[in-house]
């Protein structure tokens, strides 16, 4: 990392009860499972020697719990931003994948298989999510030029951003690598206002 680059570390939250149950989460409340808490603590142990100039998190309970378990001694340093929340899914939130697949197959199919076509009343589409994720991460990167920041957010949020800066299309958003719980991504932001990926879902590039 040169002095002109911002190093951005993006983390997905730990496993939640709704992950286990197979529910659409969005901005509704779900909480970490015991496994999810352990994942966050293990991640925190791996990061213990890395100094972050700023730590940001989505204010959702699952990301808040993840951030607190990663940095238990820095709870007062974590800043929670509404712009980092997961894709808003409207009436799908809290519903089982299996129920939506059976009763609203088009929405299910578009979300998982044709994300560029996904459109549900009261929900964000993936273009809107991509614009939101890119805008806030660019802003936070510019605020810490030459520094290192951490962002705890959500699977679709991070995937939308990574897909965009990797110059891929929205329809490719769910292509591998899969964004596992507590996945660690690293991106560099340079003085020319461009991003480059150095780690994607735990895989170094």
Task: Label each residue range with its predicted role.
Residues 169-194:
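Domain-level recognition of soluble alpha/beta enzyme cores
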Residues 155-159, 196:
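GST superfamily/GST-like fold recognition
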Residues 44-109:
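Phosphate-coordination/substrate-recognition cap region in phosphate-metabolizing enzymes
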Residues 49-51, 140-147:
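Glycine-rich phosphate-binding loop signature in dinucleotide/nucleotide-binding domains
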Residues 20-23, 106-120:
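Short, basic/glycine-rich phosphate-binding loops at helix/coil junctions
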Residues 14, 155, 203:
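Active-site metal-binding loops of divalent metal-dependent hydrolases
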Residues 9, 15-66, 120-134:
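Loop-to-helix element that buttresses phosphate recognition and phosphoryl-transfer chemistry
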Residues 8, 147-156:
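Generic beta-sheet signal
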